[in-house]
Amino acid sequence: MDNCPPASTFLTDSLELELQTEWCNPPCFSCDFDNRGGGKHFSGESYLSSGALKRVILNLDPLPTNFEEDTVEIFGIEWVTETALVNSSRVLFHLFRQQLYNLETLLQASCDFGKISTLHCKAHNIRQLCVTFLHYVKVFIFRSLQVRNAESHVPVHPYETLEAQLPSVLVDELHGLLLYIGHLSELPTTNTGAFVNQNQTKLYPPSWHLLHLHLDIHWLVLEILHMLGEKLKQVVYSHQFMNLAGDNLTNVSLFEEHCENLLCDLINLSLNRYDKKVRPSEALMSHHCPCPCIKELWVLLIHLLNHRSKWSLSESFWNWLNKLLKTLLEKSNDQRRSVLIVQPRDPLGFSWWIITHVASFYQFDRHGTPDEMRQMESNWNFVEELLKKSISVQDGILEEQLRMYLHCCLTLCDFWEPNIAIVTILWEYYSKNLNSSFSISWLPLKGLTYIIKSPLSMLEMVKTCCCDKQDHDLYKSSSSYTIFLCILAKVVKKAMKNNGPHPWKQVKGRIYSKFHQKRMEELTEVGLQNFFSLFLLLAAVAEVEDVASHVLRLLDFLKPTFKTSPLIWKGQMAFLLMYTQKNLDIGVLAEKFSNAFREKAKEFLVSKNDEMGQRQTLWTLLSIYMDSVQEVFETSRCLHPSHEKLLNDGFSMLLRACQESELRTVLNFLQAVLARIRSLHQQLRQELQREHGDLSVQSSLSTKERHLAAVASALWRHFFSFLKSQRMSQIVPLSQLADAAADFTLLAMDLPSTAPSDLQPQPVTSMIQLFGWDDIIWPQVVARYLSHFLQNSMLCEALSHSGCVSFQALTVRSWIRCILQMYVKNLHVPDDSFIDINPEQAVEKDYMEQLTELTRLLFKLSEVKNIFSKSQVELPIPDDPKKALIRFFEAVGITYGNLQTVSDKSAMVTKSLEYLGEILKYIKPYLGKKVSSAGLQLTYTMMGTLVKSWALIFATSKAQKLLFRIIDCLLLPHTVLQQEKELPAPMLTAIQKSLPLYLQGMCIVCCQSQNTNAYLNQLLGNVIEQYIGRFLPASAHVLGLGQHPVLLALKNSASVPPMSLLKKCIVHVIRKSYFEFKGSLLPPRLASILAFILQLVKETNTDVSEIELLLPGVLKCLLLVSEPQVKRLATENLQCMVRACQVGSGGEPAAQLTSVFRQFIEDYGMRYDYQIYSILEAVAALDQQVVIHLVPTLTQSLKNSERKWGLGRNSAQREAYSKLLSQLGQVGQDEIQRLENDHIESML
């Protein structure tokens, strides 16, 4: 025992039982144990865990396995076990005090890390010696002390004399020991922390050992005195000491004196902690025990004192503690008893704090094990007095203190049996202060705003108050009044559970009696809030119907104001919600509240243009009603006729009076109720299927379904007519309009009979027609509505089997319209606002997402999937609705082209036109005065794609009219035909980008048309005529013509016949419109058109017949125009055309080309002979044969010219002609010779 242990070693109870004959370390106070898991409260070698307390209480051997040998070593000396205490008691206690002194001297040594190990071992050994001695005293009293008869006159042995004196000696020595060690509070400050060495062994300073040894001494003295009394069954008088009253000191008086001093010490320790470290807000989280050993000492005292009070006239623990605490609460020093307790700064607060924490120790049993189910002994009498003092302070009660007091009181209500008197005392205070906010200026009250927010939040507050476990942060989150409500709830619930309704009647009488008309009129807004909180809580824990009816009677005394009306409505609606949660009939409340709602809705409608203050107040009340009714529907297990009362014509009036933001709230309410009705209907259908054979259950479920239908009919009556009237309006938020319409459609599917007569006999189809297929509805509404509709597989399946065979085609039509009109909503915004914005960004993000979702769902329709499957066009990714529409148009065109039979083609044309509907109406908004670049671009691109992809369809007589209208509307509107008017730049840009699509499509139609259509050919010519010139570059650069839409149409055309037709038409337009020389007036923009022709000839396989049409104009330009650029371009054209003719005729001179030149010579040879020769020289350089074929014509033209002028031989002309002939080889030389011969003959 003298050696220092490496760590805290002890034997558990089970090991102690197994090793019955082995020495066990005696129990002692120790906080050196591992509690990282949080499960252990005391050390294994403590008085509780080791079973030492139990042995004392049950009067068992304190240490059955110790001190069994004949001798025992105490303080390093061997003693005879059975006689040592009798023979040498004073010596032993003297040695004990010496050891104490040795330990105290160790405190003077410095505790650095180098010395701590030695100091720890020394102090530990001293403590073990002292504790072992006191346990030896206990064991000696139990085993060896003999009870002698004091009246016996028989001679006794000297030992027996000493033995008889031992109890008095022990009282003397124990009293002297207590005087020597003094009070716990007088010990030097102790650091309860430990040093940890490299072996992870905890080493404690001497001060720690001294504190714990003092604790051991204080407790073991009590044990020894208790055992002495139990053993002797009589009072033991001291021989040396008297108590403070002058009486002889006895074991009983010493026990009581020491017990009182020890409790005073513990209170002082707690006081020191309370005054320095405890804030009111942290009172219950700040414990009063500096270490577990102090806590153990409290528990030991509780058990020991309560045990003694049961079997003797001694006082219980609570009486001891109450007696001491009362001295703290005395107002004058003269009235206080002479106890050694420091006066605290807050006696009331400290008393609440210490009582609450000490009460929690009652949960520990004799082994130190917590047992929450254990019945705890209460101390209500003292707490009642404490509570009265707490709320009757004359100087005024501080809220921050009151919260702490009541929080402690609430905790005690958890521990102890219910006490109605507590509620009565508190109610007397709060009934007088209902108008107080119970707030703390420096602490924001979280709960107040939370409570006032809504009826549901008021109920949540009540539920919080009724919870069995309260938040530790209650001080900061709730007022003292709220904590009072928690106390009220807990006490009433517990009392009614134990004693039936009688406690409730007591409480009800006390509370109801405080409210009458005058008191109700005195309540402020805060007072009303507290009033509702109180009665809602009473309704929650007791008779809700009785409380609610009483509250309504009390409210009739009030005349609501603008400030109090919202609160009154919230409170009333909170009772309605409580009825619903408790599954009670809400009929009476629903009738009363819905009538009030109707009246307020009527006022709201009338006050539409009145001042905003009154309107805002009315809207607040109406919002409270809607929020509460929504909550009623969402929390009701099933609907009853009384639910229909909540939906009256007040909503019809309200809807007409609402502005946009207010409408959002009403429609949110509507959607929530619709969703709840459908959910309940689905549950009923499932239950009907499960209970197919049980007629009684089926009858009950059918009744519930009728109730559902009645509520649904009310919604149709009071909401739908307004929604229907707002289909084309922008007052109602479009997304909510679509959502509400979709919900009504699903309701029509579930309960078709509830729909109004104008939607019958097929309400679902009628609804979709109104909100999904009608072309006058905003596309934002349609897209969102159809997305809801297509997501519901049951609805789609029902439509498929309802005879509505066109529902897929009509849905596709609406989808096309939604895409084409995606920019319509932005037409009111100036177009320059979107200069730097991507077109997709010009569309609302929500709408683009909705279009994407609609596209995804649409591509799942069987009809659409079938089209893509037949066309073998891959289904596009729906992330880009515009690209998806283009792919759809292409897929339809390819599918039609793959059809073989006439009937299939005719049906496909009909279906395709059904997809388009009045498509020109969809794009009409973009073609008005308000310009949208993105909208025009979208329109022209989509329609161009349609014209090209559906060219074969437009070739049919059924579809050709639509094609004509498209061309007239988009490419040949009146503004285009009026040459003096410039087209808007965005429109011109859109046409330029999409014109190739139209031209190619029109050419295909012309080639494939079932009947020769002169009008269509004329349209094609008109389009080319209008846009060739509009898109010619300002300067005649051939490089700039590469992107001319007319040329692009030729480049990108995959089929030869349409390209040939298009080129032929282009050539005719150029010849007609740009090569008409009227007198001296030259055709406009000759250079640009020549550049265009040059590009045309270079990039296409120009036919000789087309060159035959263009070449005269080019020759005229060379002949008649002197502008250098025109001459250069005309020369290049001439060269290209000659080369093209060479290629086309296989190297032989083309007859058509020769014919063109011959006619040119005949027309202009008389006047422009020199220019003609110059032109032909250029031609001869490319193709001599062409010019050789023209020699006879040229010679004849020369002769005719000479004859006309009548001047004989024209030498200059002949010389120019000879120059040309000299370039023609032998044929030219022969002709020169022939002309010379003719001249000679004429001379002769």
Swiss-Prot record:
Subcellular location(s) of the protein: Nucleus; Chromosome
GO cellular component annotations of the record: nuclear replication fork; site of DNA damage
Record bears the keyword DNA damage: yes
Gene Ontology biological process terms, A to Z: chromatin organization; double-strand break repair via homologous recombination; replication fork processing
Protein keywords: Chromatin regulator, Chromosome, DNA damage, DNA repair, DNA-binding, Nucleus
PTM statement from Swiss-Prot or TrEMBL: Degraded by the ubiquitin-proteasome system upon replication stress.
PANTHER family reported for this sequence: PROTEIN MMS22-LIKE
Function: Component of the MMS22L-TONSL complex, a complex that promotes homologous recombination-mediated repair of double-strand breaks (DSBs) at stalled or collapsed replication forks. The MMS22L-TONSL complex is required to maintain genome integrity during DNA replication. It mediates the assembly of RAD51 filaments on single-stranded DNA (ssDNA): the MMS22L-TONSL complex is recruited to DSBs following histone replacement by histone chaperones and eviction of the replication protein A complex (RPA/RP-A) from DSBs.
Subunit structure: Component of the MMS22L-TONSL complex, a complex at least composed of MMS22L and TONSL/NFKBIL2. Interacts with RAD51; interaction is direct.
Family recorded in the similarity comment: Belongs to the MMS22 family. MMS22L subfamily.
Record protein name field: Protein MMS22-like
